A protein has these predicted regions:
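Generic detector of short alpha-helix boundary/capping microenvironments
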Residues: 16-19, 181
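Hydrophobic membrane-insertion alpha-helices, especially the h-region
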Residues: 18-31
Length: 313
């Protein structure tokens, strides 16, 4: 009986050890998952940088009028925005290559910056991306905010332009809603949405037309669109807005990934806010096969963007 009791006690002890190890392992897995979510998925918020300068400081700094080119959900500019920047800055205009800025989304949007802005470069192109791919508009909002704050801290920036491609356009709109009237930051002059994603691919309803969408907004509304609809009036009314959309195949009201009911879903909001708003649609020429993922390489899109940003500089 005594030996049997000892065996039973050992069995209980082994069970207790095994159960303890199991609990520790579960806690560890949950901890890693929580850390991953915080560093990879959570928008977080960058530290606020309040920039105040004297007139003497402003006079001594290089004055620039930058244009931010914000990438899409891949995060990296090299597959899309870099082609657009290269094409635009190679044309006969005032634009020149400037900086490539990558925001570390899990590190309070610390910026990794390459390139330089030379003394004679008044209209630098700034490519903006993130260290991890995302279609979260809030993450892009903070990446843009950190970039603008960096530029304002190191240069005299009377104003800037901004282009957002795909998900980056939704992020740019969210940034403009929340920060375009922030007196600590320079004002935005023009906003271009290149095949911008605002309404999570929501399509027209059976009885709905694009004309009714332009007049009244979409009937199918995503959570992102609901945010824009609730907050659009916070955006600076002086910003000139350009919404661009590819049509492929011709007459499909589709860019290969996103329907026009998404790309133009916010047109009505800009109109109601009093922003001068223009729509630009384009199609493939014979022999061309551009779609949403390659639109930054399309000559027609590049030419229009150059005209918008640099025709009067």
């Amino acid at each position: 009986m005594k030996k049997r009791a000892q065996k039973s006690k050992k069995g209980i002890d082994m069970f207790g050890v095994t159960f303890f190890v199991f609990i520790v392992a579960v806690i560890g897995v949950l901890g890693v998952a929580f850390y991953y979510q915080q560093t990879k998925a959570s928008p977080g918020e960058p530290s606020t940088r309040v920039i105040k300068k004297t007139q003497e400081q402003l006079k001594s700094e290089l004055t620039i009028y930058p244009t931010l080119y914000v990438t899409g959900s891949s995060g990296t500019p090299k597959n899309n925005i870099s082609h657009l920047v290269q094409a635009v800055t190679n044309k006969n205009n005032t634009a020149k290559p400037g900086l490539t800025v990558i925001a570390e989304t899990g590190n309070k949007y610390k910026l990794r910056i390459t390139g330089k802005i030379d003394a004679g470069n008044k209209y630098p192109a700034i490519a903006v991306g993130t260290d991890h791919g995302t279609n979260n508009h809030e993450i892009y909002q903070y990446a843009i905010k950190a970039t603008i704050e960096y530029l304002a801290a190191h240069y005299n920036v009377p104003w800037y332009n901004i282009l957002g491609y795909s998900s980056g356009a939704g992020g740019a709109m969210r940034f403009l809603i929340n920060y375009s009237q922030d007196k600590n930051l320079p004002p935005a002059k023009k906003f271009v949405a290149l095949d911008g994603e605002f309404n999570r691919k929501e399509k027209l309803r059976a009885n709905e037309s694009m004309e009714s969408l332009y007049q009244n907004g979409p009937e199918n509304k995503s959570a992102d669109y609901n945010y824009f609809e609730k907050n659009y009036s916070k955006m600076d009314k002086g910003i000139h807005v350009y919404l661009m959309a590819l049509d492929t195949p011709v007459g499909s009201d589709f860019d290969g990934v996103l329907p026009w009911s998404d790309l133009f879903s916010v047109y009505n909001l800009f109109e109601k806010n009093g922003n001068v708003t223009e729509k630009f649609t384009y199609t493939n020429s014979p022999g061309e096969r551009y779609s949403h993922g390659s639109i930054c390489k399309m000559p027609a899109a590049q030419d229009y963007i150059e005209k918008v940003f640099y025709s009067s500089t």
